[in-house]
Amino acid sequence: LFTATLLYHVNRVFAQQYVTTEPLLKNVLIEEFTGRNCPGCSQAHLLANNIIKKYPKRVFVSNIYGFDTPTYPNLVTQEGNIITHALGATAYPSSQINRSKDSADLGVSEHDVNLFIKQEAPCNIGGLVVVDELSRTATITVEIYYVHDSDNDVNYLTVEMLQDSIWGYQNNGMNNPEQYVDGNYCHMHVFRDIITSTWGETISPTNEGTLITKTYTYIIPEIIGDPSGVDVNINHLKFIAFVTNEMIGAESRPILNVARLPFLIGTQEEVFPCIDDISYKDNSMCSNSKSFTIDM
């Protein structure tokens, strides 16, 4: 009985590879509803950027584009439209902070960010994204560790792909000089796709001490948007994962925690190193220790 109990606790606490088991404060996701033709949106981008600078690695932004004509760069997506309508965005710019309200607020509320950033998170999120550049295959591993019990027996895990550095038109882009160069605007944190279902994959159990690991294989599209789509540059991608508490109406909210997943461009093929040659260094020296050069 003692042995079985010991192994059980080892598996629960030490099986994780990426996520910490220590209590942490909540991170924040700003879902910003924006558009290239929106006259006030560049200022909202600037405000969101300043919040990111204030809370590095704690605040993340997903810019969901609407309010646009289908000209290049067409940043509107079907999934983005579903989220926009469900989260109550009826004007631009507007935002949801951790999906905490029935409808989106105008602009970006730093006040709401400040509230959430001080709260303890019920769960921590970690993981890794490895992309095989040749096949454009992303292998996404997400770990969720529950530091405290969730309010619900079932939560929802969502993984999103965002893209930086998409150049194109932005109404009043000069109001955000950080992203405006020679009349061209650099669109950042652009929502591109959801790897899970729109409102997340169900995860359980959600009680304290539970570790959940999910792995996804995703083929990164060459282009997103129709018509006037945008090339999906692998080097400009980032992936975020967040956990929501429950389904309320058609959407899952509020967000319990969010994290950006580390991103590597590499291969999933196994590597088998072999020794090709071994040679002595300074082999004329008399000593009990030897130095070797090994070619692999």
Task: Outline where the language-model segments fall.
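Short, solvent-exposed loop/linker segments at the N-terminal edge
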Residues: 131-136, 282-290
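Generic recognition of flexible, low-complexity loop/linker segments
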Residues: 18, 226-230, 281
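Short, conserved sequence motifs used for protein processing/export or organelle targeting and
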Residues: 57-271
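Acidic, Ser/Thr
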Residues: 295-296
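Bacterial Sec-dependent N-terminal signal peptides
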Residues: 1-21, 159, 267-268, 272-275, ...
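Local sequence-structure signature of Cys/Sec-based thiol-disulfide redox active-site neighborhoods
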Residues: 19-60, 64
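Short, solvent-exposed loop/edge segments of extracellular or virion-exposed proteins
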Residues: 32, 276-287
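General secretory precursor processing signal
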Residues: 41-44, 277, 289
